[in-house]
A protein has these predicted regions:
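C-terminal accessory nucleic-acid interaction domains of nucleic acid-metabolism proteins
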Residues: 1-61, 65-67, 78, 82-83, ...
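Short N-terminal amphipathic alpha-helices
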Residues: 77-92, 98-100
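Signature for HUH/AEP ssDNA processing cores
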Residues: 129-202, 213-221
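Short beta-strand
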Residues: 88-91, 197-203, 244-248
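A contiguous, low-structure linker/loop signature
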Residues: 97-151
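Beta-sheet entry/capping signal
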Residues: 45, 85-87, 98, 196, ...
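A short beta-strand motif that forms the metal-chelation/ATP-contact edge
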Residues: 208-214, 255-259
Length: 333
């Protein structure tokens, strides 16, 4: 494949022919007594199945509870998913069960599900589902998806992302306190370049830091800049940070500033995603003041983050806005 081809992947946004009713409800309450249920949103019907199945048996959290959570946070979540291809990670037997990745939207499927058809290598076209509204969100979660993994670029130009980001992941021997220290170092580095940046817990072991950028540079160009920043951080903080991607060569007791997640076609768990962890933790936006004071991954769980969202709103709202995005073009070589 030539470099030019790598930087251009044809995509086609197939919007559903069936029009949605603008007045469709944006909230839903699922009865705890129901095991199977069909919800109607205007002219969209969503079938929910196996609602009583325990997805976290130790916590007594059911599939119904998971779907209800996503319904409750949909107003802050949906702007971050809209118009983006979704990679499905399905857990049919709950958080501790086996899972599998699924890119192709299953068929048959509701006629109102939008599709992002992306050409990969050798002309292979993958028809990804797109979560545009509450019904499509509930449909995807009902398939057994616990967390959500959307593309960094919107479907109308899948080669040009809206973000530059870093995945901070502790190498064995490093602590979460080391991750928080690394997050502050990343913040200092990107803010020295006048880049705005926002943090969230991964809900697993680390922290994600995102920089909203003006769409224009290709995914490869964004990856290159992220790599340069990560390498500088590692050289300036050798006892704390590593940017070595190969596991066998990676020094222990460091925090990996993973720039490689900026590669084309990669995804990270979205903001507000529940993670398949023993405590049903959530990838939640956090303030820099909270990072400075100290937080724990387990502070943010399916059972308690709704109160936080109600109080603080969407701390990541700027990531979904067209305003105050960083112009990366001057940094391209």
């Amino acid at each position: 494949m030539t470099k030019a081809h790598r930087d251009y992947h044809p995509a086609h946004f197939r919007r559903a022919e069936q029009r949605r009713l603008k007045a469709a409800p944006q909230t839903v309450k699922i009865p705890r007594s129901a095991d199977h249920l069909e919800l109607e949103f205007g002219n969209q019907q969503v079938k929910l199945t196996n609602l009583k199945k325990l997805f976290w048996p130790e916590l007594k959290i059911t599939k119904r509870d998971l779907i209800q959570y996503y319904a409750d946070v949909s107003s802050v979540l949906l702007p971050h998913l809209k118009d983006r291809a979704m990679v499905m990670k399905r857990y049919p037997n709950g958080a501790a069960g086996d899972f599998f990745f699924m890119k192709q939207a299953p068929s048959p499927r509701p006629s109102w599900i939008d599709i992002c058809a992306i050409e990969h290598g050798s002309g292979n076209i993958v028809n990804f589902p797109v979560i545009q509204d509450l019904p499509s969100l509930l449909w995807v979660i009902n398939l057994g998806c616990i967390d959500l993994n959307q593309w960094y670029a919107r479907c109308d130009d899948v080669d040009r992302p809206d973000y530059l980001h870093f995945d901070l992941d502790p190498v064995p021997g490093a602590t979460f306190e080391n991750v928080l220290e690394t997050a502050l170092a990343v913040r200092e580095a990107v803010e020295s370049l006048k880049m705005p940046c926002y943090a969230k817990t991964t809900g697993s072991k680390g922290v994600h830091i995102y920089v909203p950028i003006v769409r224009g540079p290709t995914q490869k160009q964004v990856w290159t800049i992220a790599k340069e920043i990560a390498l500088v951080l590692a050289s300036e903080n050798p006892g704390l940070i590593t940017a070595v991607y190969k596991v066998a060569k990676r020094p222990k007791g460091r925090v990996l500033v993973d720039y490689n997640q900026n590669a084309w076609g990669r995804t990270l768990a979205s903001v507000y995603s529940v993670r398949p962890t023993p405590k049903a933790t959530v990838s939640i936006p956090v303030t820099w003041e909270e990072i400075e004071k100290g937080i724990r991954i387990d502070d943010f769980r399916l059972d308690n983050v709704r109160k936080r969202i109600k109080k603080l709103g969407d701390l990541w709202k700027p990531l979904a806005s067209e305003r105050k995005r960083f112009q990366l073009e001057p940094y391209l070589k």
